[in-house]
Amino acid sequence: MTNYIFVTGGVVSSLGKGIAAASLAAILEARGLTVTMLKLDPYINVDPGTMSPIQHGEVFVTDDGAETDLDLGHYERFIRTRMTKRNNFTTGRVYEEVLKRERRGDYLGATIQVIPHITNEIKRRVIEGAEGHDVAIVEVGGTVGDIESQPFLEAIRQLGTEVGRERAMFMHLTLVPYMPASGEVKTKPTQHSVKELRSIGIQPDILVCRSVGALPASERSKIALFTNVADKAVISLKDVDSIYRIPAALKAQGMDQLVVDRFGLECNEADLSEWEQVLYAESNPTAEVNIGMIGKYVELPDAYKSVNEALKHAGLKNRLTVNIHHIDSQDVESKGTQILEQLDAILVPGGFGERGIEGKIAAARYARENKVPYLGICLGMQVALIEYARNVAGMEKANSTEFDPETPYPVVGLITEWLDAAGTTEVRTETSDLGGTMRLGSQLCHLIEGTKVHEMYGNAEIYERHRHRYEVNNNLRDQIEAAGLKVSGLSTDKRLVEVVEIPDHPWFIAGQFHPEFTSTPRDGHPLFTGFVAAAGKYQKENH
């Protein structure tokens, strides 16, 4: 039977509930337990798929094609369990399902209310997502006291009561601010946050106190006294220079043992040796490289969270410190490619819309002509293709129909039909809804032997996650290949181009998929590892 740990946050948002929860999950997994994680998001959007990356951060895509909160990326980077569409749902998704059932008549004429109908649907989804694991860690988005969070908090209160104290724990994350003027930390915000939580019927079993420095024992005891939490269950979580230090920090304070004792689980001591190797590599680099990420959402780094992390993971594998320079593609348009001259490699990530596209195309051209290592992801592949078509294949004004519907050379166009991972034919048109209509999730890709990308993966068949609605136009593919661009990966039905590369370039690879979603600190990812290695080589030879 599954045991539940419900995670809530108080005082302020952005305290790192997802990181703290994932770190606890990593320790429990290191003890031999099977662990999964769920994120409950209080916003009314059905999913984050159509939300602005500048507001919400990146959209993380799972193997089964769910467009989810970026916290699921943290979960997959900390534990081996792969997330699915069951691991993240929103208020909008819950209401959509309840209203659908009401229209069908499933409720037999009852008046539909938040309690019990909405809360029952939340509980059903939590139980379904947790099924089959020793422990499920359930994170509730937002902050205690938010109006939007109330149905979720009520649902987890009910579920905790229904499964019993032997199978449910509540973990609350709060801020303990430091006041420089008095030289003191202040516990009052934490006391009030717990008071708010208790007013709705939830007594936390573990308090994780975020602070600038380690909390003195006297302050931990004071918090324990006023919140009715055991002294040993008040965990101090100070700021650290690497999030991968947090599992060891929590284990040192016995957090995993609190969970094991509460649930009566028999398991081994946690083996964190893999995390120790990660920290050693992070602390002992042999050199550093400068990689430019040419994007359009650079004002919010979380918009490219998984790409940032994947580059860091590749740095660990190469024992290199990766300095990531987020460069607005519109700056490349206005200031020219001279702003790229000090870079050791260039990465163009995914994105949508015409704004800044010419800057990305210029960056791809700069990388090609100056033999700078280049990695294109999704849109990054499309701009590389457009650039090559224009400047090498002689297709003047070549473009994507997304940006110029009247282009004389539509080298990239809307995918109108494709086979999904289950073998089902999907059809789209220009008038299809934006939400949930892209080619999504893990897809099989066949790599061409003898290519650089085949060398990187060491395999002819790979699975990578996708999120796009535009693809290479096969009607112009032969003409571009004849000019020297190599198609090095194709979809299962051979109809969609998945990877391209330039054979006479030291390292120029671009893929329609998103390899960043499967990179982890312990394993890295072959494409990113190869890319950062190429950056290191370029740096030695040119800088």
Curated annotation (Swiss-Prot):
Assembly and oligomerization: Homotetramer.
Keywords annotated in UniProt: ATP-binding, Glutamine amidotransferase, Ligase, Magnesium, Metal-binding, Nucleotide-binding, Pyrimidine biosynthesis
InterPro entries the record matches: Class_I_gatase-like, CTP_synthase, CTP_synthase_N, GATASE, GATase1_CTP_Synthase, P-loop_NTPase
Annotated residues for binding of L-glutamine: G351, L379, G380, M381, Q382, E402, R469
Protein name in UniProt: CTP synthase
Binding of Mg(2+), residues: D71, E139
The family this protein is said to belong to: Belongs to the CTP synthase family.
Organism per entry: Alteromonas mediterranea (strain DSM 17117 / CIP 110805 / LMG 28347 / Deep ecotype)
Name of encoding gene: pyrG
Positions annotated to bind CTP: S13, D146, I147, E148, K186, T187, K188, P189, T190, Q191, K222
Lineage of source species: Bacteria, Pseudomonadati, Pseudomonadota, Gammaproteobacteria, Alteromonadales
Binding site for ATP: S14, L15, G16, K17, G18, I19, D71, K238, D239, V240
Function: Catalyzes the ATP-dependent amination of UTP to CTP with either L-glutamine or ammonia as the source of nitrogen. Regulates intracellular CTP levels through interactions with the four ribonucleotide triphosphates.
